[in-house]
Amino acid sequence: MGAVPYNWILGACEKVKSVVSCPVATVGRVVSVEAGEKILEDGTADIIGYGRSLLTDPDIANKVENGECIRECLNCNKGCVDAIQSRRYLSCVLNAENGDEETIFIQPCTETKNVAIVGASLAGLGAARVAYKRGHTVTVFEKSNRLGGQINIDSVPPRKMKSYVLFNTMKNSYPIK
């Protein structure tokens, strides 16, 4: 998780906007559509640059238009910032298809099945998402009384609460029993 505050560059953006007459863009942990909309409505910036958010969910614009849930960036920096710094292939822990969109397609199945997923961690729910998108009926089994697996531990520090918020978005994104 990043230790830099959300929307951290807005102060500088406001200063630039006050002295120029051209459109001004902002970046810097603007990780949700709601945060971006507020910045635009307040007039702080004219354009929002979603970087890592688009690695997590490249279909944000269509999902906003259709009222669908969006996978939000955790700001964990694994696969994106870490990869850039070590000159590796870009990826995202929440988007297995990232970087392979033109070669990996979630195809509808020819025969629907009842699919059982054991464990409701991020990985389990990710598998459930793919099975559901293929057309299967999905049931997730979890032995504890809380869904999320290790995300429950990860989200304890205050700056990591985003993990739990994201997990709740994921578990409510698809009709999974």
Regions inferred by a protein language model and the residue ranges of each:
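Flavin-dependent oxidoreductase catalytic cores
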Residues: 1-118, 122-138, 146
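Beta1-alpha1 glycine-rich phosphate/pyrophosphate-binding loop at the start
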Residues: 117-176
